[in-house]
Structure formats: C-alpha cells, structure tokens
A protein has these predicted regions:
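Short aromatic-glycine-(Arg/Gly/Cys) micro-motifs in beta-strand/loop hairpins
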Residues: 1-17
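Serine/threonine-rich, low-complexity intrinsically disordered segments
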Residues: 7, 23-24, 52-55
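A short, exposed loop/beta-hairpin motif centered on an aromatic-Gly-Thr core
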Residues: 14-27
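Short, low-complexity, polar/charged sequence segments that are solvent-exposed and flexible
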Residues: 25-29, 39-42
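Short, mixed-charge low-complexity intrinsically disordered segments
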Residues: 35-55
Length: 55
C-alpha cells in the first residue's frame, strides 16, 4: 500500500474537527490522530467516498 492522505474524525461529533494525516493505512492514520485526541475513530482516504470505523 502506498502513502495516502486520510481524513480522520470523531463519529457523532457535531462540531467535527477533521484531521488530514499522511499514512499508509487506516490503522496508522487512527494511531496518529489519537496522539491528538483518543476519541478519533473514523477515517477515509481523501477523495474516496467510503470510510471505516475503528471500534
């Protein structure tokens, strides 16, 4: 897998702060976002309309 820009956010947060993180995988993007706030659990590749949730 190559490097991608991931949009990461907190599920259900009405005032969403979206982070953009460069990472190779969903897990790496979530791990980096959780250095800012442990609640980050949703991510999608920039320009892609599918997303994944980390439970």
């Amino acid at each position: 897998m190559g490097w991608k820009i991931w949009k990461v956010w907190v599920e259900g947060d009405e005032c969403q702060s979206v982070l953009r993180i460069i990472a190779q995988s969903f897990d790496e993007a979530i791990a980096e976002a959780r250095k800012v706030d442990v609640r980050y659990n949703m991510a999608q590749v920039e320009g892609d309309y599918t997303y994944a949730t980390y439970n």
